Curated annotation (Swiss-Prot):
Zn(2+) binds at H55, C80, C89. NADP(+) binds at A159, W175, T201, D205, S230, G301, A302, Q303, L304, H305, S306, A307. Residues 6-127 form the CMP/dCMP-type deaminase domain. One of its GO terms (biological process) is riboflavin biosynthetic process. It comes from Chlamydia trachomatis serovar D (strain ATCC VR-885 / DSM 19411 / UW-3/Cx). The lineage of its organism: Bacteria, Pseudomonadati, Chlamydiota, Chlamydiia, Chlamydiales. Binds 1 zinc ion. Keywords: Hydrolase, Metal-binding, Multifunctional enzyme, NADP, Oxidoreductase, Riboflavin biosynthesis, Zinc. Residues 151-375 are annotated as: Reductase. SUPFAM superfamilies: Cytidine deaminase-like, Dihydrofolate reductase-like. This is Riboflavin biosynthesis protein RibD.
């Protein structure tokens, strides 16, 4: 629908900002925000803080500062109308006798889609869908994509020197970007439900793949660490197999020795096996989506990044440009794609910012392979 007023857009943007507060803990649920307004003043606000906890609308109602009768509700995603871990939000809004509900986006979840709106309308409450829809879509893109495609939103993350190299000639890629950039990566990891890396990256850098605050403390919720290794070449003493600070999934093939797999299982590592001679990346993504992953972060290296690009599985990316030059003996960001200017992947730059001594570039892919849940 057409935006009715700048004031309504303002309140929806506020709801989107509130929803973002739940981005780390809400998944596999969407990070929804809600604002309740009466006589032009905010009388209640809330956001979904995690699975099993009250939804945004309930939190906003509980935050009320006066009677909700005649109030307007601004919510980023269509209110739910089914019993899950919590009761339907529409019933509470109807009981509260609100005057109108403004919805940023319809929920693609078939249990909710258009049903929540219909329930409210059947109760005589006007519902306006589409206010601030672009802002809501930008915020909830991983959730929307996962529900519509059956695949998580894939973000390619890498750090590169100013001449585009992601590792030195020996293959080491640690500390290309600055300290604040690495802190920013910690937040990006925390906002993702899984981090995917290749065997070479683990062998060369031995990363922990943990999500940390700038001062070094771990985020309370850690992403699943996923190691892609077709043959079982990663040393068993690698940090990613230390489960004291997070879980690890080992994605492999039938070429991996059974003894190696058993040792991983003895360590508590989950093993996902592909029947082909290479790890089925799309099948792996589908499995992660079934586990509730809305966004996954692919951290490389170049071989794994290239495989995701070749299969058109990348949705967006973040590049941290460090203040270094590594020369033509370094490792490229992507390899063996054999693209020309005509066949090159097109992206839209969504952000360029300075993170102290590094430059952060964010992009979204414009050309995506058409996929469905059976694809």
């Amino acid at each position: 629908m057409e935006v009715l007023s700048e004031q309504q857009l303002f309140f929806m943007r506020k709801a989107v900002a509130l929803g973002e507060k739940g981005r780390i803990f809400a998944p596999p649920n969407p990070w929804v925000g809600c604002v309740i307004v009466k006589n032009g003043c905010v009388i209640g606000e809330g956001w979904h803080q995690g699975i099993g906890s009250p939804h945004a609308e309930v939190c906003a109602v509980q935050d009320q500062k006066c009677s909700l009768e005649g109030a307007e509700v601004f919510v980023t995603l269509e209110p739910c109308c089914h019993f899950g871990r919590t009761p339907p939000c529409v019933d509470l809004l109807i009981k509260s006798k609100v005057a109108a509900v403004y919805v940023g986006l319809l929920d693609p979840d078939p249990r909710v889609c258009k049903k929540g709106v219909a329930r409210l309308q059947a109760a005589g409450i006007p519902v306006y869908v589409g206010v601030g829809s672009q802002e809501a879509k930008t915020s909830l893109q991983p959730y929307l994509y996962q529900r519509e495609r059956g695949l998580p939103w894939v973000v390619m993350k890498t750090a590169a020197s100013l001449d585009g190299q992601t590792a030195d000639r020996g293959g080491s890629s640690q500390w290309i970007s600055g300290e604040l950039a690495r802190a920013d990566v910690g937040k990006l990891r925390a906002e993702s439900q899984a981090i995917i890396v290749g065997a070479r990256t683990v062998c060369l850098d031995n990363p922990r793949l943990s999500a940390r605050f700038p001062h070094g403390d771990l985020y309370e919720r850690q992403p699943l660490r996923v190691v892609v290794d077709s043959r079982g070449t990663v040393p068993l003493e690698s940090r990613v197999f230390d489960l004291s600070s997070g879980s690890t999934l080992f994605a492999t093939t039938q070429q991996c020795p059974k003894e190696y797999i058993q040792k991983l299982k003895d360590l508590g590592v989950e093993v996902w096996e592909s029947s082909s001679h290479q790890v089925d990346l799309k099948g792996l993504l589908r499995y992660l989506a079934e586990r509730g992953c809305l966004q996954v972060l692919v951290e490389g290296g170049a071989q794994l990044h290239s495989a995701f690009w070749q299969q058109k599985l990348v949705n967006a990316g973040v590049i941290y440009w460090g203040p270094k030059f590594l020369g033509d003996q370094g490792q490229p960001m992507l390899r063996d794609l054999q693209l020309s200017l005509v066949t090159a992947e097109h992206v839209r730059i969504t952000e360029t910012s300075l993170v102290r001594d590094s430059v952060k570039t964010c992009f979204e892919c414009l050309e995506q392979e058409s996929v469905d849940k059976k694809g």
